[in-house]
Amino acid sequence: MVNIIQDFIPVGANNRPGYAMTPLYITVHNTANTAVGADAAAHARYLKNPDTTTSWHFTVDDTEIYQHLPLNENGWHAGDGNGSGNRASIGIEICENADGDFAKATANAQWLIKTLMAEHNISLANVVPHKYWSGKECPRKLLDTWDSFKAGIGGGGSQTYVVKQGDTLTSIARAFGVTVAQLQEWNNIEDPNLIRVGQVLIVSAPSAAEKPELYPLPDGIIQLTTPYTSGEHVFQVQRALAALYFYPDKGAVNNGIDGVYGPKTADAVARFQSVNGLTADGIYGPATKEKIAAQLS
């Protein structure tokens, strides 16, 4: 168990919106702050700065966890406006300060996530990276090994191992009675000589339950209408397209991911269709869904 310190952002602060929330997701971030001393306590102080506009629920370092918001209130951390990332997910920042132990901070975050999943009946499939909501490359230190990170939460049946100094993929494979090829497949490792200390590896076959669809896609047809169609199903299409670099409005707030199927989203769909051999009509339907899913798999 890791010590959790409640240090809430003051009521009425700009970054404590106070909207009621029933958590359906857990969103994982890295702080992207490598400064010495940039631990959980430092981020708690930062969130109380009157000029700070963002907020999240927990910051985790290698020794402790700070809670900044009650879990029945939302924060501004996911970059999707009033979408489910901000309004229905618990935001967790993992510290990467130079004087901390990132592997231990990651393990502490996994423990916290497992605890929150049990308390709020949140499935492992609904533990998502910040990138899921807005396309931002976050958590930057975990995206390449996201499946391993989730397996380490303990929501499934896979065994995991943290790479130590002197380990090789061959020695790890031998220790767990598996092959190097299996370790490469389970952990998306192209070069077996490139593993790093602190990396979390899956060392037994992942179950299907541990491989949730990162970018779920809606069924049916979505097209330009008056008024514009909006909702979570549009967010899903926009996030998936952004993951393939077909942004609704690159450079705009959240790259145009706003949950509204307007002309710019229809254009992103048409651009995707054009380069994938489909009729470029800007209408999302079964054929477009199939192509997007294939590109993401």
Curated annotation (Swiss-Prot):
Record-listed E.C. numbers: 3.5.1.28
Cited SMART domains: Ami_2 (SM00644), LysM (SM00257)
Pfam families: Amidase_2, LysM, PG_binding_1
One of the GO biological process terms: cell wall organization
Residue ranges of domain LysM in the record: 159-203
Subcellular location: Secreted
Cellular component aspect of the GO annotation: extracellular region
Leader sequence residues: 1-44
GO terms, molecular function: N-acetylmuramoyl-L-alanine amidase activity
Keyword set, alphabetical order: Cell wall biogenesis/degradation, Competence, Hydrolase, Secreted, Signal, Sporulation
Keyword Hydrolase attached: yes
Catalysed transformations (reactions): Hydrolyzes the link between N-acetylmuramoyl residues and L-amino acid residues in certain cell-wall glycopeptides
Keyword Nucleus: no
Domain N-acetylmuramoyl-L-alanine amidase intervals: 45-140
Top-tier EC class: hydrolase
Role according to the record: Autolysins are involved in some important biological processes such as cell separation, cell-wall turnover, competence for genetic transformation, formation of the flagella and sporulation.
Stated family: Belongs to the N-acetylmuramoyl-L-alanine amidase 2 family.
Protein name, entry field: N-acetylmuramoyl-L-alanine amidase XlyA
Protein species of origin: Bacillus subtilis (strain 168)
